């Protein structure tokens, strides 16, 4: 029967259920599979049962939390999607004093509950509907990461359903202090190894968490593309100013650690380039210093900053003003915590350890302004450049599975559209832009670049093992051999056990 319940509150949603068309879709509408069922689970015990049934019946399974996987890793045919989005508990264990987050929590769930109940937070992402299940284990970051590091830098333990050598599904809890090397490998693999590799995460554990700011300063300003087209040198000046500021102010302990910015380099059709900045805390000076640095050398007679009117993808801005606003931190977080419409999309990423070289700035200009039959105008395409570094870079590259610990900027290439007929032109634009920036091998680590971000997964990458994980990949392979010997959990770019 449709909606045939397994054990309340979990239920099985099959193709004849009216919920099925919704539950087989995620954020990226390019990926729609046709699984035998979607198992909406309500607790860890149910997950063990579902995983065991899939193993016994030789059915492939995938896991969905918030549904924000950029590629089609979760969508599948003739298998089972384990939907953990109902596991949304967040709290503090009265016996251990540890904080916990269940894997179905969204970013907004964790911000809201941790702040209201305990006055703490996690340096997680700016999209409210992203699920903790995939976000944290991929090394999630956000607007407090320069201040507090990555989500995984606070992780102390993980509860996960694995399948052992005897093909038995079981719930295990491992921590940073687990007694065996194998258990420590499994814990470490969840500090940036990414989702869909080792098991079904049910809960994250944190011995301590950073205190949340009480307030924050926000500013959002824009520059008109019409001015930039007329004065190309000013575009290069803004881009260089941005890179140089963070090249000089991203070391651990920097007085600008509380400052985080998002530069939305939209395509020309969007009308504006938009900059959003947050400074956590009551001190406005770091924000003012940064904004002054951004417009250093900019001839305001030729180009003036204006109030933004453009929102791209899920990224919001503070509208209708060019002035900084002081507000309670949770309110500021909510103001920037957009999600946007579910559309078709494609994404790519790169870490940078230095400001933009001249050749890259030339490529950025070309691919943001190009409009022709092959690359038609799209106001929903952009290169987003996030600030990075500071507390993130205080951690050794092998202390977690995230090896990029010397970067100052994190780039996300994005394009959104609605109709399948538009797939080819959008994929061509983003793919050709990316190759113009880095060549066919992608952003291989060197003195300027440092690979790619596993949570912005990209099926086009050939040497993804090195671009995501660098020298940390062999230890991930070891954890795979130990904890998923039958490769139950796999996808196009999942960790391979190897020899």
Model regions: which residues?
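Conserved, mostly hydrophobic/aromatic
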Residues: 54, 165, 484
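Short, structural beta-strand-to-alpha-helix junction motif
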Residues: 46, 97, 101, 105-112, ...
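Glycine-rich N-terminal segment of FAD-binding domains in flavoprotein oxidoreductases
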Residues: 17-18, 28-87
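Cofactor-binding catalytic cores of oxidoreductases
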Residues: 10-26, 66, 71-73, 217-499
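FAD-binding subdomain of flavoenzyme oxidoreductases
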Residues: 124, 129-230
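General beta-strand structural signal in soluble alpha/beta enzymes
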Residues: 13-15, 40, 61-65, 82, ...
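Glycine-/small-residue-rich beta-strand-loop submotif within the FAD-binding core of flavoenzymes
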Residues: 45, 75-105, 143, 147-148, ...
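Extracellular/periplasmic catalytic domains that process cell-envelope and extracellular macromolecules
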Residues: 6, 28-33, 55-56, 73-76, ...
């Amino acid at each position: 029967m449709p909606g045939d319940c397994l054990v309340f509150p979990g239920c099985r949603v099959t193709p004849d259920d009216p919920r099925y068309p919704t539950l087989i879709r995620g954020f990226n509408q390019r990926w729609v599979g046709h699984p035998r069922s979607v198992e909406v689970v309500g607790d860890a015990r149910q997950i063990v049962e579902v995983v065991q049934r899939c193993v016994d019946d030789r059915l492939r399974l995938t896991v969905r939390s918030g549904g924000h996987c950029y590629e089609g890793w979760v969508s599948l045919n003739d298998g089972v999607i384990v939907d953990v989005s109902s596991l949304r508990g967040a709290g503090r264990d009265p016996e251990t004093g540890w904080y916990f987050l269940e894997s179905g929590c969204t970013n907004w769930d964790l911000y809201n509950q941790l702040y209201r109940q305990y006055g703490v937070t996690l340096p997680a992402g700016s999209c409210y509907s992203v699920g903790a299940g995939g976000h944290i284990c991929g090394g999630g970051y956000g607007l407090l990461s320069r201040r507090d590091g990555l989500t995984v830098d606070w992780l102390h333990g993980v509860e996960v359903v694995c399948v052992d050598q005897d093909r038995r599904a079981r719930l295990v809890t491992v921590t940073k202090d687990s007694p065996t090397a194998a258990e420590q490998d499994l814990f470490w693999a969840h500090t940036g190894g990414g989702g869909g590799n080792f098991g079904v995460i049910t809960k994250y554990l944190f011995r301590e968490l950073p205190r949340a700011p009480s307030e924050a300063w926000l500013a959002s300003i824009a520059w008109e593309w019409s001015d930039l087209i007329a004065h190309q040198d000013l575009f290069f000046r803004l881009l260089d100013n941005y890179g140089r500021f963070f090249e000089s102010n991203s070391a651990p302990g920097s007085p600008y650690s509380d400052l985080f910015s998002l530069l939305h380099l939209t395509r020309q059709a969007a009308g504006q380039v938009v900059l959003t900045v947050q400074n956590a805390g009551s001190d406005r000076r770091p924000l003012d210093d940064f904004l002054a640095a951004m417009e250093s050398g900019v001839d305001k007679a030729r180009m003036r900053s204006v109030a933004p009117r453009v929102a791209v993808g899920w990224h919001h801005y503070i509208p209708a003003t060019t002035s900084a606003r002081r507000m309670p931190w949770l309110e500021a977080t909510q103001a920037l915590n957009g999600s946007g419409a579910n559309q078709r999309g494609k994404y790519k990423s790169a870490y940078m350890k230095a400001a933009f070289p001249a050749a890259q700035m030339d490529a950025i200009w070309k691919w943001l302004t190009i409009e022709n039959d092959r690359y038609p105008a799209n106001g929903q395409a952009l290169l987003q450049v996030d600030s990075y570094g500071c507390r993130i870079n205080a951690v050794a590259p092998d202390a977690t599975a995230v090896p990029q610990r010397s970067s100052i900027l994190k780039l996300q290439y994005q394009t959104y559209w609605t109709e399948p007929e538009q797939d080819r032109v959008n994929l061509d634009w983003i793919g050709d832009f990316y190759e113009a920036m880095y060549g066919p091998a992608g952003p291989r680590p060197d003195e300027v670049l440092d690979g790619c971000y596993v949570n912005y997964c990209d099926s086009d990458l050939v040497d993804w093992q090195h671009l995501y994980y660098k020298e940390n990949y062999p230890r991930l392979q070891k954890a795979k051999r130990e904890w998923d010997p039958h490769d139950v959990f796999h996808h196009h770019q999942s960790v391979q056990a190897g020899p």
